[in-house]
């Protein structure tokens, strides 16, 4: 199957792809991997894929106070799952709750898949109800394997749905927009994951616990960076006399081991040892575990062994092709691109994707590309390699129609971070390079707001003239702007002393015009922060302080509501040096602004609150209290 990978070669996949990137590598000393090719498949009565060694040994974890018991485990059968004493036949009241739980699971899946934003957001109300229902001990003891699996899968799916939807949006998520619930929705999701984890760790679901449920849970925890909690849950579970075997199944190991290695919970040699012990009797270990081991080997710099793992995946797919095995191949291929420090190897795998020369499909995920950009720049003295990878990635995403907004944002953010590191000073070469990069991007795809936002954010040259030229590109390329770009431009003026108060006020007015056209009826805190950074937090605060307080006095009642006013002043109470001046806006009825600020005619922006009334008590309390250290 894996032939003709190269257009001019008919060797195996290894000869056309793998051997080209082989370089002299010193493989860390470790026990050899299982390479058994016995024709007789081992009959393993252990349903959890655990090595039932007769040696009662303990594997002491690096940087951990606990020990993972890798001795023989009690074999679990379905009969045990059905007859465990924790299971209780539900009474009538519990049956009613159980049916409601089932209905909520169905409703949750329907709302999660809904294209309508309102329906999708209603999902989190359902999820919160499900999480609260699990607090009922009788209900927990009435759940079966299928229901627990459905619930864990719902949590797992919600994380991906939430992040995909948010990253695809063009709008900015302001936490002061109370009607924009994506922030609070994520709080609900995080809480549900932690609540479920606590119940699992307490042993509440032993009678219906499976490796798939555990995989979903651990992966969800890792997504939210609950790393310590997840690893502790796993380590404690391994040592559980009843369900320890579940924690050593391939799906679980594939989820845990990469993160454990990343966090230095285990050394590379210890990881290999765990793998060998749990796959010794298997001719072909599970493809997800092989993928995980390949990625760990890459991170450890053991590229020779990583290539061996890739070849094993190819062999396994060749014997029995499935979509899941293809996904594993793709995942490990991406790891060679983003995690490999040998740029020649990484480039080879990158080019195979760009040139579409693979017998399997690889979606070029941006985090791996940004990592590749970083590695390429760190490995060389110039930006040449990084430019090659960036240009080809931009063109690839455009050609394959993979134009998720966040994809370009992440890619461009990393690239221009590196660009201004490589060219910290403005000169003829750096200016020409930046101009050529902008031209390339505009010729490849329509120039967008996030692209210009990224350049302006990272712009570090001292020239105000060039910065103004960059800002003019929004109009030159007819870019559709949101309040985000206006905030970025306004904030950027704080880094340059050459901007006059009139110029800053003009940018503030442009910002308000955009808010008004975007049907905002209030000025969000994000805009107040941008004004602050452009004035009293600028490199010349003495020249711009009066402007800030004058604008604040003029537009103070344009905040969203009393809660927004209190939040705004609350931030200033933590900064005693500014508190007295801020207090004047609240306490002086006849405050005289030093700078004249004219209010244009708005269609949507309006006064919403009496700022002085909303903040008076907080200001008085803050002034009377002792300054915070």
UniProtKB/Swiss-Prot annotation:
Phosphorylated. Phosphorylation promotes binding to RNA. It is a peripheral membrane protein. It comes from Scheffersomyces stipitis (strain ATCC 58785 / CBS 6054 / NBRC 10063 / NRRL Y-11545). GO terms for biological process: sporulation resulting in formation of a cellular spore. GO terms for cellular component: mitochondrial inner membrane. It is found in: Mitochondrion inner membrane. Residues 34-57 have a biased composition (Low complexity). Monomer. Belongs to the RMD9 family. Keywords: Membrane, Mitochondrion, Mitochondrion inner membrane, Phosphoprotein, Sporulation, Transit peptide. This is RNA-binding protein RMD9, mitochondrial. Binds the 3'-UTR of mitochondrial mRNAs. Involved in the processing or stability of mitochondrial mRNAs. Residues 28-57 are annotated as: Disordered. Residues 1-62 form a transit peptide. The gene is RMD9. The lineage of its organism: Eukaryota, Fungi, Dikarya, Ascomycota, Saccharomycotina.
């Amino acid at each position: 199957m894996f032939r003709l990978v190269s257009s001019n070669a008919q060797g195996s996949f290894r000869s056309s792809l793998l051997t080209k990137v082989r370089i002299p590598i010193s493989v860390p000393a470790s026990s050899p991997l299982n390479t058994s090719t016995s024709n007789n498949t081992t009959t393993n009565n252990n349903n959890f894929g655990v090595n039932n060694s007769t040696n009662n040994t303990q594997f002491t974890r690096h940087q951990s106070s606990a020990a993972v018991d890798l001795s023989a485990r009690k074999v679990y059968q379905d009969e045990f799952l059905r007859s465990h004493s924790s299971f209780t036949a539900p009474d009538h009241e519990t049956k009613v709750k159980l049916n409601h739980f089932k209905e909520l699971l169905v409703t949750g899946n329907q709302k999660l898949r809904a294209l309508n934003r309102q329906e999708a957001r209603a999902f989190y109300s359902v999820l919160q109800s499900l999480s609260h229902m699990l607090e009922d001990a009788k209900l927990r003891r009435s759940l079966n394997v299928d229901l627990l699996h459905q619930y864990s899968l719902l949590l797992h799916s919600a994380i991906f749905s939430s992040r995909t939807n948010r990253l695809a949006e063009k709008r900015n998520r302001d936490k002061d927009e109370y009607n924009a619930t994506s922030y609070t929705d994520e709080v609900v999701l995080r809480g549900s994951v932690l609540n479920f984890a606590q119940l699992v760790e307490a042993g509440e679901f032993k009678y219906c616990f499976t490796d798939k449920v555990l995989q979903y849970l651990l992966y969800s925890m890792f997504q939210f960076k609950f790393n310590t909690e997840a690893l502790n849950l796993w380590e404690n579970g391994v040592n559980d006399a009843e369900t320890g075997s579940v924690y050593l199944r391939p799906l679980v190991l594939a989820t845990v081991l990469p993160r454990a290695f990343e966090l230095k919970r285990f050394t590379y040699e210890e990881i290999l040892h765990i793998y060998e012990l749990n796959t010794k009797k298997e001719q072909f270990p599970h493809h997800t575990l092989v993928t995980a081991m390949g990625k760990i080997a890459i991170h450890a710099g053991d590229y020779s062994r990583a290539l061996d793992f890739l070849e094993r995946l190819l062999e396994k797919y060749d014997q029995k092709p499935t979509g899941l095995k293809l996904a594993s191949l793709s995942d490990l291929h991406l790891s060679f691109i983003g995690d490999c420090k040998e740029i020649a190897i990484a480039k080879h795998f990158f080019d195979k994707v760009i040139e579409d020369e693979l017998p399997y499909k690889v979606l070029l995920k941006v985090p791996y590309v940004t990592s590749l950009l970083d590695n390429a720049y760190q490995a060389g003295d110039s930006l040449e390699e990084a430019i090659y990878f960036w240009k080809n990635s931009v063109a690839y995403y455009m050609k394959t129609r993979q134009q998720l907004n966040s994809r370009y944002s992440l890619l461009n953010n990393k690239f221009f971070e590196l660009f201004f590191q490589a060219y910290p000073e403005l000169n003829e070469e750096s200016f020409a390079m930046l101009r050529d990069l902008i031209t390339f991007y505009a010729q490849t795809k329509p120039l967008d707001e996030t692209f210009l936002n990224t350049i302006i954010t990272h712009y570090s040259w001292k020239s105000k003239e060039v910065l103004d030229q960059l800002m003019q590109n929004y109009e030159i390329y007819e870019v559709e702007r949101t309040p985000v770009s206006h905030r970025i431009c306004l904030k950027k003026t704080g880094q340059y002393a050459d901007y006059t108060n009139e110029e800053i006020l003009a940018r503030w007015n442009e910002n308000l015009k955009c808010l008004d056209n975007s049907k905002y009826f209030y000025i969000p805190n994000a805009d107040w922060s941008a004004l602050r950074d452009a004035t009293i937090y600028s490199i010349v605060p003495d020249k711009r302080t009066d402007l800030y307080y004058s604008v604040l006095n003029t537009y103070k009642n344009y905040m969203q509501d009393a809660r927004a006013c209190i939040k705004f002043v609350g931030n200033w109470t933590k900064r005693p040096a500014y508190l007295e001046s801020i207090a004047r806006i609240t306490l002086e009825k006849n405050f005289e602004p030093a700078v004249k600020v004219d209010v244009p005619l708005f269609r949507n922006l309006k006064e919403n609150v009496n700022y002085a009334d909303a903040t008076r008590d907080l200001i008085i309390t803050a002034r009377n209290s002792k300054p915070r250290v």
